[in-house]
Each structure stands twice: as C-alpha cells, then as structure tokens.
From Swiss-Prot:
SUPFAM superfamilies attached to this UniProt entry: P-loop containing nucleoside triphosphate hydrolases
Family: Belongs to the DEAD box helicase family. DEAH subfamily.
Catalytic reaction list: ATP + H2O = ADP + phosphate + H(+)
Name assigned to this protein: Putative ATP-dependent RNA helicase R563
Amino acid sequence: MSSRLSYVNVDDPNFYEFIDEKYSKYKIPPKQKTFKQFCFPSKYEFQIPQQFLAEYINPKTPYKGLLIYHRIGAGKTCTAIKIAENFKNKSKIMIVVPASLKGNFRSELRSLCADDHYLTSKERSELKILHPSSDEYKSIIKVSDDRIDKYYTIYSYNKFVDLIKQNKINLTNTLLIIDEVHNMISETGTYYESLYETIHSAPDNMRLVIMTATPIFDKPNEIALTMNLLVRNKQLPVGPDFVSTFMDIRYNSKGPVYHVKNMDLFKEFVKGYVSYYRGAPPYVFPKSELFFVRTKMSDLQKTVYQKITGKEVKQTKVRDYVNENISNNFFIGTRMISNIVYPNEKVGLKGYNSLTDEDLTIAKIREYSPKFLKILRKIKRCNGTVFVYSNFKEYGGIRVFARLLEFHRFKNYEFNGSGPRRFAIWSGDQDPIYKEEVKAVFNNKDNEFGSKIKVILGSSSIKEGVSFLRVQEVHIMEPYWNFSRMEQIIGRAIRFCSHKDVELDRQLVKVYIYLAVHPDIKMSIDERMMKMALDKKMINSAFEKALKEAAIDCELFKNANVYPGEQDIQCEQ
C-alpha cells in the first residue's frame, strides 16, 4: 500500500500540478516528428500518450477510471493494450468492443504493440507469406488466440449486456476496457442502464477505462451519462437537470439559440477522469475542402415536396432539437423527396417501381433528381476514386443511384469483377468476406485512378472502422441532424497517412454535402437538418473544449493538441 501514498487524489487542489511534475518526462516537445517519420516509420515505437497512460492507470497507482478521449491516429487500441499488459498477472482483463471490431482488437494484440507475447516474430514472418485460407495460417492464428484467451476476455456489446442480464458478469478485481463507448450511451437504451448498474455495484478493486474519439455523438447530455460511469461520488446531473445546469436556451423567430454556462462547475465534475490527445498532427492527413452544394429543386420536385411536407408537419413537433430525441422517421418522406422524386409521385418502393430506364436519361433525371445529376457529372469528371454516401440505403438513395450509374455504363463490381467504370455497394447485409475483398481491391495502389473500382456507394453501416485510401471526392447526398455522423463518414476517406504515396496535388479530398433548396420556402428540410447539425456541433464543441481543458494530461500533451492558427486550450491549474 505504501507506494500509493505518494499519489495525489483526483479532487486534491494540487492534482494538476502533481501530474505535471510527476510525469514531466511525458511532456510532448514542441518539435514533432516529420510526415516521413509518421507515415514511413523505420521501427515500431510507442507514442508518448500511450506510455504515459500505461503509467497512470497501473497496479501501483490509486486511479480507478478514465475516459480516453483520443482522436484519429492516436492508437487507442494499442493504448488499451499497453495499460492491460501491466495488469495481466494481477487482475482479470475484460474488453468490450463493437462486434465488428473484435477481430481488430485481436490483430492489435498480435502486433508489435504487445511485443511477441501473443505472436512470435517467427510466426509473424510466416503469416506474411501464407494465404489466410491455408491450414498453416489458421493454425498459427489458433495458437495465438489461445495465448490471448489466457489473459483477455473479449466481448461484443450484445454478449456483454446479455451476460449482465443473466448475472454472469463478475467485475471483482477486473480491469474493464470499453472501446467506442459512445455506442453504449443513451438515456433510454438498455445497454446503458445495464452497464451503469453493473459498474456501480462492482467492488472497489475494479478499474474502468472507456475510450472514444467522439465523447458527444449527438446530444450534449451524453457526456454526463458517460462521465457518470466513471465518477462514484459526485454524479453529474442528467436529462433536463443537465440542460438547466449547463445550458441557456432562448427562442426567437428563427428557432432556439443555445449558449453554455457554468463550465467551471462542469470541469470540476470531470477533473481527474479525462485524458485528451488529438492524435496524429494535421499534416499526416490529406487536406480537405468542404462544399455545401445548394441544389434547386425541379418544378416536379417542388410540387411533390409541398404535398408530402404538409402531411409530415402535423406529425412532427420538435422544438429543442439539440436536447430532444429525434426519430429516424423525422420528415423521412420529405427528406427522400429532396433526393429524388419518382414519376408516379409516390415515395419508397411504390415510387421506385414506377421508375423505368427511360426515366434515367440526363433530360429526365434533371427533373426527377437535380442532386443525382450533379453527383453523376462530378463522378464522370473525377480523375480518381470517389465515395458516395446516403443515409437511405434503398429507395431514397443508394439503390436508385446504383441504377442510375448502371444506365450510364457503369458496372457493379459484385457481378462484373474489377475494371474501369466499376462501382461497389457497401451495406450491412453483405458478407464480411466480400467487403474485405472490395476494400482490398479499392485500396490497392494500382487502383489510385479508379481502374479497378472507381466508386464506393455506402450507407449507415459504413460509419466505423472502415478506411478507404487515396479517395479524391466524397459526396454526401443529404445532411444528417448531427455533425458527428457526417464527420464519421468523411473520416472514412480522410485517414491517417491515407494519401502518403500519391503526388502532392492529389493529397486533397473534396467533400460535397448536397442540400435541396426550395425557392418559395425559407428553409427546406435539408437546410433545416444542416442548421440542426451545425447548432449541435457548436454547443457540443463547447463541452468538448471543457473536457480538453480539464484533461489530466492537458499540459503534458498541449504541444501536440494545438497547432498554429487554431483556437487555444487553457489548461486547468
């Protein structure tokens, strides 16, 4: 116990001073590594934040829990492993991740992040030359998995929550690590309730590490729910109490106007429970340009839009859109019509079935979907690969756009294999092996100009854990009511070192977000959705800034978190 006496409690007035002094060797210097050192490293090295956190959450320290708010290129998974490796002979290690990322966590344990503990250097060399379907390859992976399973229990969210409900999760003397924790946060969701109760009924010798690059995905109140998993004695207010404590809302003729308040109080609540690291510096990502493409509705679109919106207005009453729950059916007909109107003026399958090949000519599509026409023309002109996204997988977006591409002499990769003018659809109901194949073909250097697959068409299943390389253009067919979703989509194409091996003038991604506008209406549904997203982004950014300033490592990592020309972070003292 004596070693713990030399540590300062998180609510001690001198806590930040203690951290800065005790861990001063982890202060990131002003001079950063170069683009080449980041993207073409000559040897494997741990990043400074990974080293610091493995020292901070450690069997010899008293610190029980932490939110690791680290962004893209920070190596969050390896950070978790570096922390866990210090506990593996002393505690149980339980990992909870989205089902789609379970394999990714095991791969990271097989990497140099965990040294040669779960895969020897000889085995690593053999895997590089063996085919993944071969018996030898599978045998090496099986042996490696057995080594991992001796120390790590890895659950998907669903499995973990099922076991909680069956009373089969025992967190005594456990290090619990939850990745992409924002997926489990919701006032009304069953995941959160089960998670909260299990964590708060766990014995004092449990430690909790939760990780996310987006601590507020939709509503500001999510950060209170997240932090309340970590803090035992001073819970943040939630729901309407959170709003009244930390936000001012005024209403004028244009709708609500939002401001934050009591940020010092908010920082007091989260003090000692947040680590913030921006991740890789801006110069290792491709540059990006964002364009809002305001597309005037056709006469037919205007007529159908007014008819549908008249019905939907009666069903939809959302006043405070930053804090209220919004259903996926929010103005769904109006939103689909803003993308495409069908010849029989119906929406959904009935509308789609009325669309014939003659309706896909340039002259006709100009009347049915000015948006689609603009996207089609940009794809044809683009000298490289393109990622097209819609929230609508079927009749208001991807499915019908695929038909348009086929009519204009593009071919579906699934049925025609690779070649020029190919597109591939990426959706949740496809075989994971097929998606891996698409990604491998698309991301190969020899596809830089789209000679194998030019266009990826994606819907909401593409949000997490997917990287596309060397993309030149991203087209988002319609806005969504939170900007995190749009940033997540854009982030599929703007990746850490994703354009490292292309010419300098091609290290740029042009991002287009399409808004259908109605000349006789002050604000169309697309414009309204965009305003909602930007208002939320502004208010959420204020809470995120407070998290950054209250982070335990604010001073240590400041040189890597703020770059010239950016808004400064004032670290708490």
